[in-house]
């Protein structure tokens, strides 16, 4: 009887026991390969037959009687390309350049879409002030995305829009007989200006108290026992400058002197109003004249004492927290300057609805981005600066419509009273 060779029997025993032994020992045969999708090395486990063939092929004590046919490998071969050569550097540079061009074009295309927002104006202002006010503005950059800052800036812009409208009405040529329309128009603007100043005072008090920005407060909202006046001074000086230039850019880079003086008047007392002093020096010719002792005493008499100057309040703060003297002055003005005009109930209701009409878009806010340079917010068409708010209705037009409606109601009321039989 033909005897089976020993090495063949041992090979068969090993072939039957290999999967079991491998599972018992926790060993797994397979192959590592590079996966392009995830750019990682991954392990692919062999099947039972493949593992037996690999073991027989690499085991030193056994040699197979016949060569085992190798099956096609399912995994991809690992290829490592050299990245140190100049060709690879050029290829990488080309890819990065093409990617940068595409991203720049995409950003520019996105930048031309939509409308101008307050964030656009804030960042343009910050870039504008980096050259001249770099030291003070750097401490202000962390405050840029604060919601309370946005609320305050919008309140300031609404106030300045009414203020500029009032100035334009005052500069209009006046006739000898001021009509009812002009009086009513000025009354509407003044009432809206007063309401806007009250709203601005509320938003300003939030910033002064440091409710949302304790790190900018001079006493860290009570966490510190000593007032850091230097930090407080630097922050608010940069803050006033920033607000002035935001308003200047929003109003198409016009009326800078008027905006600067009004911001200085609102948030500073007369003693510390630097723009006002500068204007007075320019009006006097800029020359320091020698004064006599009498003239010096007269000039100093106009200025308050130091104790009084410390407790003085800016016009914005006195709107919500007036002193006793300011309260008495307000009562006196309301008593003698209030116009005693009484309208019918229907007319008062109609006037109330007219006053609740929201104000139109302020300056360039809300206008299409494609009309402006995205880096400076200059209008691409120079004639746009001469136009008053373009296609959007101005505050003057709205006021004229409201006045005309009021006058129509007055005429209807008077005609109904005169047509009644006696």
UniProtKB/Swiss-Prot annotation:
Inhibits phosphatase activity of protein phosphatase 1 (PP1) complexes. Interacts with PPP1CA. Coiled coil: none annotated. One of its GO terms (molecular function) is phosphatase binding. This is Protein phosphatase 1 regulatory subunit 36. Keywords: Protein phosphatase inhibitor. It comes from the Eukaryota.
């Amino acid at each position: 009887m033909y005897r089976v060779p020993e090495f063949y029997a041992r090979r068969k025993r090993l072939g039957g026991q290999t999967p079991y032994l491998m599972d018992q020992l926790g060993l797994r045969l397979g192959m590592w390969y590079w996966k392009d999708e995830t750019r990682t090395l991954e392990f692919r486990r062999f099947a039972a037959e493949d593992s037996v063939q690999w073991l027989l092929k690499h085991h030193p004590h056994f040699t197979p009687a016949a060569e085992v046919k190798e099956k096609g490998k399912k995994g991809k071969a690992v290829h490592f390309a050299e990245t140190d050569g100049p060709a690879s550097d050029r290829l990488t540079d080309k890819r990065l350049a093409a990617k940068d061009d595409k991203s720049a074009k995409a950003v520019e295309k996105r930048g031309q879409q939509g409308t101008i927002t307050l964030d656009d104006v804030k960042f343009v202002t910050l870039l504008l002030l980096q050259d001249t006010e770099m030291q003070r503005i750097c401490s202000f950059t962390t405050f840029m995305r604060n919601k309370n800052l946005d609320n305050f800036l919008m309140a300031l812009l609404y106030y300045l829009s009414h203020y500029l409208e009032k100035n334009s009405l005052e500069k209009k040529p006046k006739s000898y007989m001021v009509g009812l329309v002009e009086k009513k128009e000025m009354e509407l603007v003044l009432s809206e200006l007063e309401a806007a100043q009250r709203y601005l005072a509320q938003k300003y008090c939030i910033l002064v108290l440091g409710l949302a920005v304790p790190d900018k407060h001079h006493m860290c909202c009570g966490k510190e026992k000593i007032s850091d006046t230097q930090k407080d001074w630097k922050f608010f000086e940069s803050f006033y400058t920033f607000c002035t230039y935001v308003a200047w850019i929003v109003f198409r880079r016009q009326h800078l002197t008027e905006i600067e003086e009004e911001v200085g008047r609102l948030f500073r007392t007369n003693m510390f109003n630097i723009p006002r002093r500068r204007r007075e020096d320019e009006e006097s010719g800029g020359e320091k004249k020698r004064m006599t002792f009498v003239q010096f005493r007269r000039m100093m008499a106009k200025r308050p004492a130091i104790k009084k100057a410390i407790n003085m309040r800016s016009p914005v703060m006195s709107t919500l927290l007036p002193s006793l003297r300011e309260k008495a002055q307000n009562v006196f003005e309301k008593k003698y300057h209030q116009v005693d005009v009484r309208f019918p109930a229907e007319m008062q209701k109609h006037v109330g609805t007219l006053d609740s009409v929201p104000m139109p878009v302020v300056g360039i806010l809300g206008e299409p981005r494609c009309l402006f340079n995205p880096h400076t917010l200059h209008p691409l068409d120079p004639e746009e600066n001469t136009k008053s708010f373009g296609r959007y209705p101005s505050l003057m037009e709205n006021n004229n419509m409201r006045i005309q409606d009021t006058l129509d109601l007055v005429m209807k009321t008077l005609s109904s009273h005169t047509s009644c039989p006696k």
